[in-house]
Design a protein with these regions (language model features):
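Extended, regular secondary-structure scaffolds
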Residues: 211, 223, 232-251, 374, ...
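Hydrophobic, small-residue-rich alpha-helical packing segments that form membrane-like cores
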Residues: 150-221, 225-243, 247-275, 280-282
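Generic recognition of flexible, low-complexity loop/linker segments
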Residues: 94, 210-214, 273-276, 319, ...
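Non-catalytic terminal extensions that flank enzyme cores
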Residues: 1-47
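Non-catalytic, conformational "gating/processing" segments within enzyme and secreted inhibitor domains
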Residues: 158, 210-242, 723-758, 945
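His/Glu-based metal-binding/catalytic segments typifying zinc-dependent metallopeptidases
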Residues: 40-42, 49-51, 162, 166-170, ...
């Protein structure tokens, strides 16, 4: 970097960042005081982020609504939705915006330099010169609005953020998290809901919304971040000349204030909604929470991550075990929040009896006191430190750019501390220090200081309340009816007119000439060839050994896969349970707690799961495997295999009390995930009506599996002997050498050792004769709705075009982008107010359309019905078509971590996708035009013809449209 030419900036700090092989620079913009960080390295996946401190003073969600709104057009890019245009037409590897409790971030990433420049330009223009001052409709669309179609009513609220937060406030886990933070920080910004409380969002006025932007969206309050291999001097010069230099320095009062400590712990009782089908008995949350210092102390923050693991995170961890043994809750877990100025630590019991609150607190304090007196298990500390350090060094964030995660982590310090801005990417010395301190009672001292002797905390009881959603809905309905009744005829007419004007604004198509202001790449900028797969098929005594030679920085990624093709249908749910049991029960040489610590102290972890692959060319054909995945540094390969053998060959299933604990935890977590990922739940269930693979997955991980687990938990005493027999038999039937395939990703130097270990492992697997009664999975179309206590819907419709005689085409990838960011986006998100909408098309023909946190139900299904007409009339000029093609390719050309390279190649192998097929798909994408898109209309009609629908949603919305369904059932029972 040519520092001499950067006359607009003052260099504050330059440091070698050895942990991430980079050089870090910290600047201050001289004219405005903007904070600027540049991290130089050879990473081609370049990242830009601009963040602002945005502490809310209430729970109207102004920071969140503003985050949505500034991306709805700006001075240089006066479109209605430049964000969507970028998604459709850039090679971005990340493009989004996020609201946190005290900051708002606008990050982008791309490997293409021109594309990166374009993204940075649009985002800078959006935050500094948004169209929100010219178009009140933006605020009304993204935040909230009165919706009144005629003067007689009814009057309702709508808005993207309003509906998003209605969904968020429907999740008890989210409600608990908010209530805990509010209980610990009642007098500062963390006592407010930055995302917005649906009850308070309509209190926000347009002028208050604009004032928030005027106050906080100024360079003097900004934190600008650049990362990767780029001309930093050029980028910083652009940022100065185009934006920062136009502003003067301004004192922005955005400092995050600290909550004064409490004299004694606060004791609070709150409530959350449950459906009528759900029990109020033993369904409370108990939370013991304490403030644990501040985010600027990297040593303490990292130490608390380790303590979270050692006390609560690991199976068999002492605090977790004590609470489970006392049957305080069906699930016990902890969390450590260090993404805000004042950090805090929680101990949470879910599925608890509120009358046992005192006992809950007493056990926590007794166990912690004993731990302080007797010392923490050294192996647990070693495992916790190694676990955190392995993850930090590996830096595998899947499809998310490394620089993005580094930048967001850096803000955890930088936002509050200009002195140590790079602390989050300089943690190796911290891990080394913790290894020194683990035998010096440092961790015990933290427990005593923060968890026992600390009065700045809260004890929160969150109780279930049947009918709470209905009472709130009735109160809102009455409030809006009263408001409508208070208006005179002129005011009502004006409200109807504003509704019409907003709809007109939303329905007005983007001017093609205006759209050209968004800079765009050319088709020639796109690589023509696919990234080759890395599959080398080897053989070990008859077992397929799929080797992926990839530079992995000394880490080996192992996947032992046992084919379950002959598994009878009635055993599939037990397969789903087995993945949660193995590795979490006692073995011949370890208790389950010792087993976890041994694995995490010596390796990067071992995890069991089930992998499913649908065949690319054969309809309804799929392969499924019970998998044991592990990762380790090459020198510890023998330890990894030793621990895998311990799990597969010596796991004890006789401890039925432990099995019941696991089942209760699986049930508890499924209750949360089925609702929070309601779109995935609904899609899988709808697909299971006609797809054997989806029916298999539903029985092993979806609604059918939850129903199996719920029954097993309720009738455990009667079923426990059968359960032990079924799991034991399943292991004998599955864990056999003839069913074993291996996928391994690593460098050549590690291969011979892994092959030797696999060869030895095969000899230890079950080889006795077994009889398996094969029974294929049957599908049954049901068209179901599953009711929840929530206030929004997840509406899914599925089908299979291959079964109707249509072939797969690469153009379907483009259609997915066009639907998600044009037709569905406009009709379901913009006009309908849903938070999200998605579609998908697989080579097997399986296809879906789904909405996310949607206030509607039947209206959304009607939107789906209109898709064929949209496709039939699809008419994009060359520029628009190129945009869609670029946006489609960006989703396929995401930079791959070493682990991803192996996984993608493995998936292609088992799905029967060759490089020739992948290249054909890419060619079809690159050569697509409007005609090839229009040709997909009959295919989409065939998908919708199946009329397979599933909805996860609120009781009132479902009951209003119950004639659409064959079955209406509660999602959660008991």
């Amino acid at each position: 970097m040519n520092l001499d030419s950067l006359t607009a900036y003052r260099l504050v700090k330059k440091e070698k960042l050895n942990d991430i092989r980079s050089t870090g620079y910290l600047f201050r913009h001289i004219k405005t005081g903007a904070r600027v960080m540049a991290i130089e390295n050879d990473d081609e996946n370049k990242v830009f982020n601009i963040a602002f401190r945005t502490p809310p003073k209430n729970s109207t969600g102004v920071a969140h609504i503003l985050e949505h709104s500034v991306l709805c057009g700006s001075k240089d890019f006066p479109l209605k939705d430049p964000f969507v245009e970028l998604v459709k037409g850039s090679l971005n590897t990340f493009l989004n915006a996020m609201t946190y409790p005290d900051k708002t971030c606008y990050p982008v990433a791309s490997c293409n330099d021109q594309d990166f420049q374009n993204l940075m330009h649009v985002y800078l223009d959006a935050v500094f010169y948004p169209n929100i001052y010219k178009k009140e409709e933006i605020f009304r669309q993204e935040g909230w609005n009165y919706h009144l179609e005629n003067t007689e009513g009814p009057l309702t609220y709508n808005g993207v953020v309003y509906n998003e937060m209605k969904g968020a406030f429907s999740s008890p886990d989210d409600v608990l998290e908010r209530d805990i933070m509010n209980s610990l920080f009642p007098d500062v910004t963390y006592g407010c809901e930055s995302g917005g409380d649906p009850e308070n969002i309509p209190d926000l006025s347009y002028e208050e919304f604009l004032d928030f932007h005027r106050t906080y969206y100024h360079p003097s309050n900004s934190f600008i971040y650049l990362y990767g291999n780029m001309d930093m001097t050029e980028k910083l010069d652009f940022i100065d000349k185009k934006y920062l230099s136009a502003f003067d320095s301004l004192h922005v009062d955005s400092e995050i204030q600290e909550q004064k400590p409490f004299d004694k712990m606060h004791d609070l009782v709150m409530e959350y909604p449950v459906a009528e089908s759900e029990s109020e008995e033993n369904n409370s949350y108990l939370a013991y929470s304490v403030v644990t210092g501040n985010a600027m102390n990297s040593l303490e923050c990292t130490a608390f991550d380790v303590l979270d693991y050692a006390l609560l995170g690991a199976p068999g961890a002492p605090l977790k075990k004590a609470l489970l043994d006392a049957e305080i809750g069906s699930d016990v877990y902890g969390s450590y929040e260090d993404g805000i100025r004042q950090t805090y630590f929680d101990v949470i019991a879910k599925g608890a009896d509120p009358s046992r609150k005192e006992e809950f607190v007493s056990i926590i304090r007794r166990v912690l006191t004993e731990i302080v007196q007797n010392g923490i298990d050294p192996k647990a500390l070693e495992a916790g430190i190694n676990c955190m350090e392995f993850r930090y060094r590996e830096a595998d964030f899947s499809s998310y750019p490394k620089g993005l995660i580094y930048g967001l982590d850096i803000l955890d310090n930088w936002l509050y501390d200009d002195e140590h801005p790079f602390a989050q990417v300089q943690l190796i010395p911290v891990f080394d220090k913790l290894k020194e301190l683990k035998n010096q009672r440092y961790f015990e001292g933290l427990i005593q200081k923060y968890l026992l002797d600390n009065t700045h905390g809260s004890i929160l009881t969150l109780n279930p309340s049947r009918g709470l959603t209905a009472r709130r809905a009735k109160a809102l309905e009455e409030k809006l009816a009263a408001h409508l009744a208070s208006l005179n005829d002129e005011e009502k007419a004006e409200m109807v007119q504003k509704t019409v004007e907003l709809e007109r604004y939303q329905e007005t198509p983007e001017d093609p000439e205006t759209a050209k202001c968004i800079p765009m790449l050319k088709r020639e900028d796109i690589r023509k060839e696919i990234t080759p797969f890395t599959n080398e098929a080897l053989d070990i005594d008859g077992s397929l050994f799929l080797y992926h030679e990839v530079p992995t920085n000394g880490i080996g990624y192992l996947d032992l896969m046992f084919d379950v093709k002959d598994l009878p249908a009635e055993k599939v749910p037990y397969l789903g349970l087995l993945k949660s049991v193995l590795g979490y029960v006692d073995t011949a040489h370890y208790t389950y707690g010792e087993l976890t610590n041994e694995i995490n102290a010596e390796t990067g972890g071992i995890m069991c799961g089930v992998e499913v692959f649908d065949h690319a060319e054969s309809i309804d054909e799929f392969r499924a495997f019970f998998s044991v995945r592990g990762k380790t540094m090459y020198p510890k390969t023998d330890v990894l295999f030793k621990m895998i053998r311990e799990i597969l060959n010596t796991s004890s299933l006789e401890d039925t009390r432990r099995l019941h604990e696991i089942i209760s935890q699986v049930k508890s977590r499924a209750q949360s995930s089925l609702v929070s990922a309601g779109h995935s739940t609904a899609v899988l269930r709808a697909a299971s009506y006609t797809s054997p693979m989806a029916a298999f997955q539903d029985a092993m991980a979806g609604i059918a599996y939850y129903q199996f687990i719920e029954t097993l938990d309720r009738e455990f005493e009667e079923r426990k002997e059968t359960l032990v027999a079924e799991l034991t038999e399943l292991m004998r039937e599955l864990l056999r050498p003839e069913y074993l395939c291996i996928s391994y990703t690593g460098e050549k130097e590690s291969l011979s050792d892994v092959r030797k270990q696999v060869k030895a492992l095969r000899q230890t697997l079950h080889q006795e004769a077994v009889e398996i009664s094969e029974q294929s999975i049957t599908c049954e179309k049901k068209n179901e709705a599953f009711t929840t206590s929530g206030q929004v819907q997840y509406v899914a419709q599925t089908g299979n075009f291959r079964k109707k005689g249509f072939a797969y085409s690469g153009a379907l990838n483009i259609l997915k982008v066009a639907l998600s960011y044009d037709y569905l986006w406009t009709n379901i998100r913009v006009k309908g107010g849903a938070y999200g909408c998605m579609s998908g098309f697989k080579r097997s023909g399986e296809s879906f359309f789904v909405s996310y946190r949607d206030p509607h139900l039947k209206r959304t299904l009607d939107v789906f019905k209109g898709i064929p007409e949209y496709v039939r009339n699809f008419n994009a000029d060359e520029r628009e078509m190129t945009k869609y093609i670029i946006g489609t390719i960006s989703g396929k050309d995401v930079p791959r971590t070493p682990k991803m390279q192996g996984a993608i190649s493995k998936n292609a192998w088992f799905c029967g996708v060759t490089e020739e097929m992948a290249q054909k798909e890419r060619d079809e994408i690159l050569n697509a035009d409007s005609t090839s898109m229009q040709a997909l209309a009959p295919l989409i009609e065939a998908v919708l013809l199946n009329n397979a629908i599933c909805v996860v949603g609120s009781e009132p919305a479902v009951n209003k449209e119950k004639e659409l369904f064959d079955n209406v059932l509660p999602l959660i029972n008991g």
